Amino acid sequence: MTSSTAAAVVTAASPFPGERPVTDAVVREHNLNEVEYGRILELLGRTPTLTELGVFSALWSEHCSYKHSKPVLQTFPTAGPQVVQGPGENAGVLRLPDGWAVAFKIESHNHPSAVEPYQGAATGVGGILRDVFTMGARPVAVLNSLRFGPLDQPRNRYLFAGVVRGVGDYGNCVGIPTLGGEVGFAPGYTGNPLVNAMCVGLLRESDLIRAAAHGVGNVLLCVGARTGRDGIHGASFASEELSERSEARRPQVQVGDPFTEKLLLEASLELITSGLIVAIQDMGAAGLTSSSAEMAARGGVGVEIDTGLVPTREAGMTPYEILLSESQERMLVVAEPYRVEEIQRVCAKWELGAEPIGHVTDDGIFRVRHHGLVVAAIPGQRLVDDCPIYQPAAREGEDARARRTAKPQRPARTDLQGALELLLDSPNLASKRWVYEQYDSTVQASTVLGPGGDAGVLQVPGTAFGLAVTVDCNNRLVALDPYEGGKAAVAEAARNIACTGAVPLGITDCLNFGNPEKPEVFFQFREACRGIADACRAFDTPVTGGNVSFYNESPAGAVDPTPTIGMVGLLARVADRVPSHFSTPGDEILLLGATRGGLGGSAYWTEVFDFIGGSPAPVDLAAERSLQRLLASAAGRGLLRSAHDASEGGLAVALAEAAMGDAYVESGFGAVADLGAYADGVPAEAILYGEDGARVVTSAAPSNVDALVSLAGEHGVPVHRAGRVGERGGALELRLGGRLFTWSIGALRRIYYTAIPRRMRHPDVDRSAGA
Amino acid sequence: MLTVAVVRFPGSNCDVDALRAVERVGVMAQFVWHRDTSLHGADIVILPGGFSYGDYLRSGAIARFSPVMQAVQRHAADGGPVLGICNGFQILCEAHLLPGALLRNAGLAFVSKPVDVVVERTATAFTSVFEPGVRLRLPVAHGDGRFVAAEDTLRMLEAEGRVVLRYVPATEESPLQPNPNGSANHIAGISNATGTVVGLMPHPERVADPLLGVPDGLGFFTSLAAWRPPVSTLSTPNP
Amino acid sequence: MSYRVQVRVMPRGGLLDPQGQAVEHALSALGFPDASAVRVGRAIELEVAAESRREAEARVRQMCDKLLANPVTEDYLLEVGES
Amino acid sequence: MSYRVQVRVMPRGGLLDPQGQAVEHALSALGFPDASAVRVGRAIELEVAAESRREAEARVRQMCDKLLANPVTEDYLLEVGES
Ligand SMILES: Nc1ncnc2c1ncn2[C@@H]1O[C@H](COP(=O)(O)OP(=O)(O)O)[C@@H](O)[C@H]1O
Ligand SMILES: [Mg+2]
């Protein structure tokens, strides 16, 4: 292939012996289009070597370059007095009291999990832990957001079971408690499950370390596991050379080793806090290539690596393979040369190797040698920054608009009584106990509120304050109305945080969408991001980082747009935390917030009417904000015995959940509530099952009710004194419009807590069927 | 002054939790590295939970050969107290400091939840402050917690009253499963004949802080703090 | 007829085998430095009713493909004996 | 000489084998009701340097007794091949 530009050769590099020549076909295999390849030729002034092509293809992939999403992401609010580190690093960092800071980040591992659910999910957790401890933070919580096709299909059960086991085994072994998550099921995820993992870590702000290479002559060290031929662009490469050499199928699956991760975690934190190193970054997607090139670009320096020095698991690996391997549990470290021995001593104590593989240079070139032969030499800053950025067309899909304006067919009989049982039996609303019991939620002995309520809460050891953490997204709302759905995801996360008594601080996001080159998908993306940005501005919760996962498509089309919001909040005094369940007979039940009866996109229509459509209730950001402030203030004064937000399934489900109690109490509580005078002119079904935002079900000791009511008045939040918490094991009685609905709490508990286990009796059967 | 050694194996992850629980009752604690060959004069040893050596092969099988374990063996043989929690219990069984073995949970999945247990034996270094028969709610979090032993070993453990903790049967209403892992005789913890070596599957160190909830685990550590060496203290009584 | 079949399911070559690594390490520390290339997998033993040894083997192969082995990460080997 | 040794470590007969039961259940649900007496254990494969096949076997027996099998709950079986 020849270059049409007559530019001077910028750098020189030779093909590695045996390497294929770079032809048009090879360029296409590397997922680079004409514009992109043209830019490579221009930037090098010559044809790249295969190794260089591999490097470009990795760094200019969607995953590393954000080429379809960058302009949209730049509209997010990222500043605030609490922000220590915004987007652009391995994790965002927010300031906490007393010199503490929190680092957190969310990441997707959707495609690896679709191929191999156990390892895909496990390595997803591994990657996100590294992103956090590489900032100098000790991971103190993980969360996960999962989506699968319906559980009546065996393949979906297999994926669900494998993913949950993978998430659990990895986090459990490393010893990080899982404090929350979410799981949803919808047909659109059948061929393409979503696996998003979030990690939250604590650090002293003074220990923060950024992944920027500095200091010409400083050494690069490869720390941790050996490099194998794992995950070398499984999808984009069908390299003839590789398939000739390999017997059957190439090992593309990355296998996680949580034990090595735990050692790497301890070694890394020791290296960082002892000041032995200049910078550290994990080798995640695109492995050594992206970690070294990005660290160099951030530091405005060049790097030179000798792939011949990288410890490998197999003999005969080429520079191409070593650069692009995604073997897990590896770190790239930059350090002053005289520190190398000390670093190796620390690593050896943790049974890890630390091998010098290169150094920082002053010429700005990303240079790779293999035992002396220069196989790649690319201007480093341009390698990282010059990928073409696209502004795809955006147009709302016809069917989305049609679905939003459609009206449901009312079933022959609307059974308002039975609807609650149906809803609690839906895997979407039922207890996720089957999932979170497989996750250690109490290791580190700091868990104040574990999974099963609203947000999780942990105590910051040695202090009085705590962190509240949650992940949320109602994908149905986003599918029907991406802008309102984006707002709703942030609002729900903030409400979950606020229910515990905490104040929302900031978010990380995992934007799971289909193919951005489809206008209807890009429309969803742009609008959902606009909603997220508006909500974050209204709540003063800046975006500190995140992850974009495009091309989530199954044979049936794109997945539901799923912008998962991971949020952290600060609970000033852990002792003030508010649980989500009723706890004391005789307490008064108060509903905070107004009900207008929005049923668009509701679980009621979906599960009972079998209808996904309608216009979701618009999110009132000001009302949400007032409610958040009220909750924090009421919790701080000890006025609340419980608080639980109404989301999927509306007030009826929220009241039932509060009454049922957690899975480990002997029994739930009865509850009597009168919703009659609550919402004038709203039909009964919409009061019970409507999904307006900004509403919370609370309980309070009778002696605190007056104070709570007047506090709500000060915050402009409507209050409805609905009824009382009853005796253990009683019934849930809801009165409205002269009608009385009664459910036995014991019966509801049986439905709610067994819905998923009943469907997962033989989880591992039929891996292949229905794929 | 009493001191406690918390042994850290590569892969231990409840080591800090155990240390903090010991310090909470005012007892000095220090970490001892698995490569150490001495316990640095500690009076009491804790083998904490976690995944020593990744729990690869069998839980506790590789850790049992760590250099420090010889010192632990000697300490136990001399009548020194040793508490193994979760992975520590598994290591004690692999090292034959306690009988039996801990196998994959009967339900096959990892189980993390609170369980109700009864304290049956209080004549141990770690349960002396409890009333016999008291019920506690403690968290479990394990994949390999099914206690098994040969028939005659089980009989011996029961006859000698060496069952320290037993899972409580469920009630009709409660969905709480009684025995989270299928252990023989619902055994959650056992001791050696003299009550100095104790292994527990539940994690008392995670519920020793009143700020986190009902501190049902605290008694194990106040018992530890009250322990005195049987003979040598006669000459130097503690205040 | 009934056949006793032994199945060995092993991690595919080239894939990381952390268990094998850990065992190799431990063996070496225990005074067996002469052990190498350790890999750890699953051993499954079952009885299968079949007309012939060939049919028994074919049957167990199906079981392996469908359930016993993970086609993405594992290889398997059979041994059929009479029972 | 180097020998390739296959070790099978199986749960001792009489002990509950929940994994084996689960696999048997799953097989039956998948249309293999003809499988029975399923047991699941560990397969370990290793190279060992030794003067003779007998020495190799003796060596691996030691490894099993010391580490690879739990004498309280497991039995093991060896097969030695050339490598
Ligand atoms: N994948 C999961 N991992 C851990 N916890 C989960 C998971 N899915 C759900 N949970 C927990 O179950 C509870 C209910 O979840 P969900 O119905 O999504 O709550 P909400 O509607 O309040 O966000 C929460 O405490 C949540 O953290
Ligand atoms: Mg909630």
List where the protein language model places each region:
Chain B
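Glycine-rich nucleotide phosphate-binding loop and flanking beta-alpha elements
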Residues: 52-53, 89-91, 147, 171
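N-terminal beta1-alpha1 cap of cysteine-dependent amidohydrolase-like domains
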Residues: 1-84, 93-99, 103-110, 118, ...
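Amide-donor transfer/coupling interface in amidating biosynthetic enzymes
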Residues: 73-77, 105-239
